[in-house]
């Protein structure tokens, strides 16, 4: 399993044959040696919203987007919101920017996505906002071997972290870069790394609560036009679970099968 490198020391040296090499001392204590002749460029990145004290894996979706993953209890979750624009079989998901068209999906039961404020720069790190028809579609929007979690699977996550009264804080990234001025109770001790990416309203099709709230779809339907979601906010450590109509715009976190 690939891992995200969160800390390393890079040194240039010579091998026994006199070849220039790069010594990479990883934060797990191991040494990786790479000949400089094999290196075209070096890119160092640190996802500051992750928990640097935990080990992350990776998963790649059907569009080639790679996400960190984290084991929490017996479950393995994506540690970022989904960014794909297709279902797992390659079928495209509509990008709906117009608020009226966004609301009208209830009459057609059509899956759709949008960026917050229709601004593609929010794709990373916040992800795409999807409607509920995407989350419940049998074609599966998650990568192969992963799925949109059910209400009960979210309950399992919350219970492992101490219950709905405190689990939200353990899911939220720390600080106020991605949560505005409050982020009360945000510890990210789980490594889930939730960010305050906002919502798309199912009442007017507009965008609200950026840096203040994050909602995720479950695959558990209430009716053919509504489903359960889970949510965290900047004002406390709670995890909220409730139902909403499928023309709301929420994020998706995938769970390994």
PLM-predicted stretches and their roles:
Residues 1-24:
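Bacterial Sec-dependent N-terminal signal peptides
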Residues 4, 28, 154-155:
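Short intrinsically disordered, low-complexity coil segments enriched in acidic
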Residues 11, 21-23, 33, 76, ...:
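Ordered hydrophobic segments in well-structured contexts
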Residues 11-17, 32, 141, 185:
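Generic structural signal for beta-strand residues in well-ordered domains
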Residues 19, 36-40, 72-75:
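Short, solvent-exposed coil/turn segments at beta-strand boundaries
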Residues 20-35, 58-62:
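Short N-terminal segments immediately surrounding and downstream of signal-peptide cleavage
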Residues 26-48, 252:
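N-terminal targeting signals for Sec/Tat export/insertion, comprising classic cleavable signal peptides
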Residues 46-257:
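Conserved positions within compact, well-structured domain cores
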């Amino acid at each position: 399993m690939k891992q995200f490198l969160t800390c390393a020391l890079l040194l240039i040296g010579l091998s026994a044959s006199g070849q220039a090499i790069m010594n990479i001392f990883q934060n797990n204590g191991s040494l990786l040696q790479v000949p400089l002749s094999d290196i075209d460029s070096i890119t160092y990145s640190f996802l500051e919203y992750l928990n640097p004290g935990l080990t992350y894996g990776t998963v790649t979706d059907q569009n080639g987007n790679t996400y960190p993953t984290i084991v929490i209890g017996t479950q393995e979750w994506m540690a970022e919101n989904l960014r794909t624009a297709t279902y797992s079989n390659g079928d495209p998901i509509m990008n709906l920017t117009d608020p009226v068209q966004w609301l009208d999906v209830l009459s057609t039961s059509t899956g759709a996505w949008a960026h917050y404020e229709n601004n593609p720069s929010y794709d990373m790190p916040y992800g795409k906002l999807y409607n509920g028809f995407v989350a419940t579609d049998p074609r599966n929007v998650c990568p192969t071997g992963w799925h949109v979690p059910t209400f009960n699977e979210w309950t399992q996550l919350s219970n492992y972290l101490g219950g709905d009264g405190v689990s939200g804080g353990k899911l939220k990234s720390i600080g106020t870069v991605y949560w505005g001025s409050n982020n009360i109770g945000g510890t990210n001790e789980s490594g889930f790394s939730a960010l305050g990416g906002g919502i798309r309203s199912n009442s007017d099709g507009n965008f609200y609560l950026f840096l203040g709230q994050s909602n995720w779809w479950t695959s558990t339907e209430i009716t053919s036009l509504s489903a359960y979601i889970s949510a965290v906010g900047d004002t406390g450590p709670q995890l909220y679970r409730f139902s909403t109509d499928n023309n709301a715009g929420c994020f998706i976190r995938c769970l390994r099968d």
